[in-house]
Swiss-Prot record:
<feature type="modified residue" description="Phosphoserine">
    <location>
        <position position="15"/>
    </location>
</feature>
<keyword id="KW-0418">Kinase</keyword>
<feature type="modified residue" description="Phosphotyrosine">
    <location>
        <position position="16"/>
    </location>
</feature>
<dbReference type="InterPro" id="IPR000719">
    <property type="entry name" value="Prot_kinase_dom"/>
</dbReference>
<feature type="binding site">
    <location>
        <begin position="11"/>
        <end position="19"/>
    </location>
    <ligand>
        <name>ATP</name>
    </ligand>
</feature>
<protein>
    <recommendedName>
        <fullName>Cell division control protein 2 homolog 1</fullName>
        <ecNumber>2.7.11.22</ecNumber>
    </recommendedName>
</protein>
<comment type="subunit">
    <text>Forms a stable but non-covalent complex with a regulatory subunit and with a cyclin.</text>
</comment>
<dbReference type="InterPro" id="IPR050108">
    <property type="entry name" value="CDK"/>
</dbReference>
<dbReference type="GO" id="GO:0005737">
    <property type="term" value="C:cytoplasm"/>
</dbReference>
<comment type="function">
    <text>Probably involved in the control of the cell cycle.</text>
</comment>
<keyword id="KW-0808">Transferase</keyword>
<comment type="similarity">
    <text>Belongs to the protein kinase superfamily. CMGC Ser/Thr protein kinase family. CDC2/CDKX subfamily.</text>
</comment>
<keyword id="KW-0597">Phosphoprotein</keyword>
<dbReference type="InterPro" id="IPR011009">
    <property type="entry name" value="Kinase-like_dom_sf"/>
</dbReference>
<keyword id="KW-0547">Nucleotide-binding</keyword>
<dbReference type="Pfam" id="PF00069">
    <property type="entry name" value="Pkinase"/>
</dbReference>
<feature type="domain" description="Protein kinase">
    <location>
        <begin position="5"/>
        <end position="297"/>
    </location>
</feature>
Length: 301
């Protein structure tokens, strides 16, 4: 391993390893080297890493970061990925949160293409957020960090609901849903779409309850007509009986769409697409394939 890849600099640190910019000495190509430390030889490779490897080996698409090589030693696992210049969060920070409408549309198209490809192959990403979307020098956007990804088959298995960084977590997951499918990723896509427009996270909650409250303030307190499955989740009774959830919060999104200048970048079609991604009822959210057919993608900016 050491002979083929020369580490150049540390570029990131995840929950179970360090990422380096490195050079493939045999080809002189710059790569990203994810080095995963194995806690003990008996424990072996972390299941998150095995999951990522098995998923990425199957996923070959222009909008998904490519796994080039896997090297395994007694106490270390190295995953070699194509190298990408930066992630979407850094890209937005560099632009001071001011992305132009054409860039937002192109990134959104790429994001949905990558998600559609995953979902067609029965893979949930489950942790879509700007730091997990990588941008190449040519401004191509690709999905990365499938550590939480899970092949879902028939989406009725019990999954852990502790997935997706809080700000991108759907209301059904916040209420403890463990039987979810592709709509959990679609909610995250909607949050990212809004963030690209306004230059800041749409729902920057401090905890689960605060997160849900921010969603209610933006979209309005849902009724059982708007969200039929609302009372069926494990935490529904506990969470929704809190005093702050008893008041009827009027939706502020209409007002914000009209008065927040950043939303004008999306145009009426973009706002309509955003609404269709951020639906309370999971089954009412557009699929990635449906979203790609939305008129927003025919608008010329």
């Amino acid at each position: 391993m050491g002979s083929r890849y020369q580490r150049l600099e540390k570029i990131g640190e995840g929950s179970y390893g360090v990422v380096y910019r490195a050079r493939d000495i045999t080809t002189d190509v710059i790569v990203a080297l994810k080095r995963i430390r194995l806690e003990s030889v008996e424990e072996g490779v972390p299941c998150t890493a095995i999951r990522e490897i098995s998923i990425l080996k199957e996923l070959r698409h222009e909008n998904i970061v490519r796994l080039l090589d896997v090297c395994h030693s007694e106490n270390r696992l190295n995953l070699v990925f194509e190298y990408m210049e930066m992630d979407l969060k850094k890209y937005m920070d560099r632009a001071s949160g001011n992305l132009d409408p054409a860039t937002i549309q192109e990134f959104m198209r790429s994001l949905l293409k990558g998600v559609r490809f995953c979902h067609e192959r029965n893979v949930l990403h489950r942790d879509l957020k700007p730091p997990n979307l990588l941008i190449s020098r040519e401004k191509e956007l690709k999905l990365a960090d499938f550590g939480l990804g899970r092949a879902f088959g028939i989406p009725v298995k019990k999954y852990t609901h502790e997935v997706v960084t809080l700000w991108y977590r759907s209301p059904d997951v916040l209420l403890g849903s463990t039987q979810y499918g592709t709509p959990v990723d679609i909610w995250s896509v909607g949050c990212i779409f809004a963030e690209m427009a306004i230059g800041a996270p749409l729902f920057a909650g401090k905890n689960d309850a605060d997160q849900l409250l921010r969603i209610f303030r933006f979209l309005g307190t849902p009724s059982s007509q708007v969200w039929p499955s609302m009372n069926l989740y494990p935490n529904s009774t506990n969470m929704l009986s809190k005093p702050e959830f008893q008041q009827n919060l009027i939706a502020t999104c209409d007002e914000q769409f009209q008065t927040h200048p950043a939303y004008a970048k999306l145009g009426p079609q973009g706002i309509d697409l955003l609404r269709r991604l951020l639906r309370y009822e999971p089954g009412e959210r557009l699929t990635a394939a449906q979203a790609l057919e939305h008129p927003y993608f025919s608008v010329e900016f």
